[in-house]
A protein has these predicted regions:
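Alpha-helical segments flanking ligand/cofactor-binding loops in enzyme cores
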Residues: 214, 243, 265-268, 291-292
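Glycine-rich phosphate/diphosphate-binding loop of Rossmann-like nucleotide-binding domains
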Residues: 168-254
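Rossmann-fold NAD(P) dinucleotide-binding segment
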Residues: 245-249, 259-277
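Adenosine-phosphate binding glycine-rich loop
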Residues: 186, 274-325
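Conserved active-site and cofactor/substrate-binding residues in soluble primary-metabolism enzymes
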Residues: 71-79, 115, 119, 123, ...
Length: 325
């Protein structure tokens, strides 16, 4: 997968065209962050591409579009860099041919329904076209299949890897990698793959978390607890909705929500008995100290570069069809 001269120029930091503004250089944290224009008030679009993409021109960036009401510009840029670096770890683990990248949309609106999604995706498409193959994207937090349809249309079905016009559902692919990681962990650590007597807490019941919870039930789990910011979403057949995932005992914590939720306080005060942390969330720990606390407590964490790799594996196949179309 090769990028073109335009993409290489941008990633190599020669003078950019007028479309992008560099807001962070790679010598700071190992990723370039570009700001792309958006024809919509209260919306800012950042693109973070890991250094490996311009260090190895045959590795274009890949990562989804995340939409959030960030507290500040710094929070949005930090998230973009962290997520791009995390995507590189996933791609490196499975040798997909991609490097890590992320599109992060900072919304000044707390209510995301105010956003003109088609206009936003048109702006994102302009940025992707300008990168000319240096970046491929798909769904992420608060973006959906309808958004991807807008993006496919605006890009001419280029640079979008979201399983559109196919039977592949990238959310199911991610959920499948979570389930596989859970079953592998249980078999390795408990002696067999029987999950019927284990208690699971699925934190976040969006597209991926809901699929994970339902699949755990289908595979024989009898104790699946579900928690979501929107209580209605946690009402999944044969599951038990809970109010506070961080205060409810379980054997398996399955993070499928926003990043950085496991803070030092959460890790230190999580109820006794937790054995494993395996989920879909990118960067579930707020910092290294939070992860270290879980480690000291004997909680086994399966890195998300393994447990949530389903979508990037699907992307690595889909990109061949996109490039040939």
């Amino acid at each position: 997968m090769k990028t073109t001269a335009t993409a290489n120029t941008i990633l190599g930091f020669a003078p950019l065209n007028d479309l992008f503004k560099i807001v962070e250089h790679p010598n700071e944290r190992g990723a370039i962050v570009l700001e792309a224009p958006v024809d919509q008030a209260g919306i800012t679009l950042y693109i973070a591409i890991d250094s490996d993409s311009y260090g190895h021109i045959e590795r274009p960036g890949n990562g989804g579009i995340r939409l959030l009401n960030y507290e500040s510009t710094k929070h949005a840029i930090d998230d973009a860099v962290r997520l791009a670096k995390g995507m590189t770890r996933k791609h490196d683990m499975f040798r997909t041919g991609f490097s890590g990248a992320k599109l992060v949309v900072k919304s000044d609106h707390k209510d995301l329904s105010f956003i003109d999604r088609k206009s936003l995706m048109t702006s994102a498409a302009s940025a992707l076209r300008a990168l000319e193959g240096g970046m491929y994207t798909g769904c992420d937090l608060n973006t959906c299949d309808i958004d991807m349809d807008y993006l496919v249309e605006a890009t001419g079905n280029r640079f979008v890897l979201a399983g559109r016009n196919s039977r592949v559902d990238t959310n199911v692919a991610t959920a499948s990698s979570v389930i596989g990681s859970i079953l592998g962990t249980v078999e390795a650590m408990e002696g067999d793959a029987d999950i019927s007597q284990l208690t699971f807490t699925v934190q976040g019941c969006g597209k991926v978390g809901t699929t994970v919870a339902k699949e755990l039930i289908r595979l024989g789990a009898k104790h699946v607890q579900t928690c979501d910011l929107y209580p209605e979403c946690a009402k999944i057949p044969k599951c038990t909705p809970i109010k506070d995932w961080a205060l409810t005992p379980c054997d398996f914590l399955v993070p499928c929500a926003n990043s950085l939720a496991i803070t030092e306080e959460v890790a230190a005060n999580f109820p006794e008995g937790i054995k494993y942390c395996v989920g879909a969330t990118n960067s579930p720990f707020a910092n290294e100290n939070a992860m270290s606390i879980f480690n000291r407590r004997g909680v086994m964490h399966i890195p998300e570069s393994i447990s949530s790799a389903g979508a990037i594996l699907a992307d690595s196949v889909e990109v061949r069809y996109v490039m040939l179309s």
